[in-house]
Amino acid sequence: MYAVFQSGGKQHRVAEGQIVRLEKLNVETGATIDFNEVLMVAAGDTFKVGAPFVEGGKVVAEVVAHGRGEKVTIVKFRRRKHHRKQAGHRQWFTEVKITGISA
Protein backbone atom coordinates (compact mmCIF):
# COMPACT_ATOMS: atom_id res chain seq x y z
CA MET A 1 0.00 0.00 0.00
CA TYR A 2 1.28 3.45 -0.87
CA ALA A 3 -0.03 7.01 -0.94
CA VAL A 4 0.79 10.37 -2.48
CA PHE A 5 0.36 13.36 -0.17
CA GLN A 6 1.43 16.97 -0.23
CA SER A 7 3.39 18.90 2.38
CA GLY A 8 5.38 22.09 2.09
CA GLY A 9 4.27 22.67 -1.50
CA LYS A 10 5.71 19.33 -2.67
CA GLN A 11 4.17 15.93 -3.35
CA HIS A 12 5.61 12.75 -1.81
CA ARG A 13 4.96 9.09 -2.69
CA VAL A 14 5.30 7.02 0.47
CA ALA A 15 4.75 3.53 1.86
CA GLU A 16 4.47 2.40 5.49
CA GLY A 17 7.80 2.24 7.31
CA GLN A 18 9.50 4.62 4.87
CA ILE A 19 11.57 7.60 6.11
CA VAL A 20 11.03 10.83 4.15
CA ARG A 21 12.61 14.30 4.27
CA LEU A 22 10.04 17.11 4.19
CA GLU A 23 10.30 20.88 4.33
CA LYS A 24 10.81 22.03 7.93
CA LEU A 25 7.76 21.54 10.18
CA ASN A 26 7.42 23.23 13.58
CA VAL A 27 6.84 19.98 15.48
CA GLU A 28 8.84 18.40 18.32
CA THR A 29 10.97 15.30 17.67
CA GLY A 30 9.02 12.14 18.54
CA ALA A 31 5.62 13.76 17.92
CA THR A 32 2.98 12.26 15.61
CA ILE A 33 1.66 14.21 12.61
CA ASP A 34 -1.44 13.58 10.48
CA PHE A 35 -1.30 14.63 6.81
CA ASN A 36 -4.84 15.05 5.47
CA GLU A 37 -3.96 16.37 2.00
CA VAL A 38 -3.78 12.90 0.43
CA LEU A 39 -3.92 12.99 -3.38
CA MET A 40 -3.94 9.24 -4.08
CA VAL A 41 -4.02 5.92 -2.23
CA ALA A 42 -3.18 2.58 -3.86
CA ALA A 43 -3.49 -0.92 -2.43
CA GLY A 44 -2.65 -3.73 -4.84
CA ASP A 45 -4.71 -3.17 -8.00
CA THR A 46 -7.17 -0.69 -6.47
CA PHE A 47 -6.61 3.06 -6.66
CA LYS A 48 -8.38 5.99 -5.04
CA VAL A 49 -7.63 9.30 -6.71
CA GLY A 50 -8.88 12.51 -5.14
CA ALA A 51 -10.29 15.61 -6.77
CA PRO A 52 -8.14 17.22 -5.39
CA PHE A 53 -7.91 15.17 -2.16
CA VAL A 54 -9.08 11.65 -1.24
CA GLU A 55 -12.07 11.88 1.09
CA GLY A 56 -11.12 10.41 4.47
CA GLY A 57 -7.53 9.85 3.36
CA LYS A 58 -4.84 10.21 5.99
CA VAL A 59 -1.10 9.59 6.27
CA VAL A 60 0.24 9.29 9.82
CA ALA A 61 3.93 9.93 10.51
CA GLU A 62 6.31 10.23 13.45
CA VAL A 63 8.98 12.96 13.51
CA VAL A 64 12.44 11.35 13.60
CA ALA A 65 14.76 14.37 13.34
CA HIS A 66 15.29 17.94 12.19
CA GLY A 67 18.35 19.02 10.25
CA ARG A 68 19.91 20.98 7.43
CA GLY A 69 20.62 19.75 3.93
CA GLU A 70 23.78 19.90 1.85
CA LYS A 71 25.23 23.32 1.11
CA VAL A 72 24.30 24.90 -2.22
CA THR A 73 26.81 27.47 -3.48
CA ILE A 74 25.57 30.49 -5.45
CA VAL A 75 28.10 32.44 -7.53
CA LYS A 76 27.40 35.71 -9.34
CA PHE A 77 30.13 36.79 -11.71
CA ARG A 78 30.59 39.81 -14.00
CA ARG A 79 32.99 39.13 -16.81
CA ARG A 80 35.99 41.44 -17.34
CA LYS A 81 35.08 43.59 -14.28
CA HIS A 82 37.00 41.75 -11.54
CA HIS A 83 33.69 41.32 -9.69
CA ARG A 84 32.58 38.10 -8.03
CA LYS A 85 29.99 37.45 -5.34
CA GLN A 86 29.61 34.10 -3.60
CA ALA A 87 26.98 32.91 -1.14
CA GLY A 88 25.81 29.61 0.32
CA HIS A 89 22.50 28.17 1.52
CA ARG A 90 21.51 25.15 3.62
CA GLN A 91 17.79 24.33 3.66
CA TRP A 92 16.15 23.11 6.89
CA PHE A 93 14.28 19.79 6.73
CA THR A 94 12.23 17.49 8.95
CA GLU A 95 12.71 13.73 8.69
CA VAL A 96 9.57 11.66 9.34
CA LYS A 97 8.81 7.93 9.43
CA ILE A 98 5.48 6.89 7.90
CA THR A 99 3.55 4.80 10.44
CA GLY A 100 0.12 4.49 8.81
CA ILE A 101 -1.88 5.05 5.63
CA SER A 102 -5.68 4.99 5.51
CA ALA A 103 -8.31 5.94 2.97
Curated annotation (Swiss-Prot):
* Domain of life assignment: Bacteria
Q: Pfam families, per this entry?
A: Ribosomal_L21p
Alphabetically ordered keywords of this record:
Ribonucleoprotein, Ribosomal protein, RNA-binding, rRNA-binding
Q: Which GO terms describe its biological process?
A: translation
Q: Which GO terms describe its molecular function?
A: rRNA binding; structural constituent of ribosome
| Classification via PROSITE patterns | RIBOSOMAL_L21
Query: Which residues does UniProt assign to the signal peptide?
Result: none
Q: Name one GO cellular component term.
A: cytoplasm
Coiled-coil ranges from the UniProt annotation: none
UniProt record similarity statement: Belongs to the bacterial ribosomal protein bL21 family.
Which NCBIfam families does the UniProt entry name for this protein? L21
Subunit description: Part of the 50S ribosomal subunit. Contacts protein L20.
Please give the function described in this protein's UniProt entry: This protein binds to 23S rRNA in the presence of protein L20.
State what protein this is by name: Large ribosomal subunit protein bL21
Source organism of the structure: Aeromonas hydrophila subsp. hydrophila (strain ATCC 7966 / DSM 30187 / BCRC 13018 / CCUG 14551 / JCM 1027 / KCTC 2358 / NCIMB 9240 / NCTC 8049)
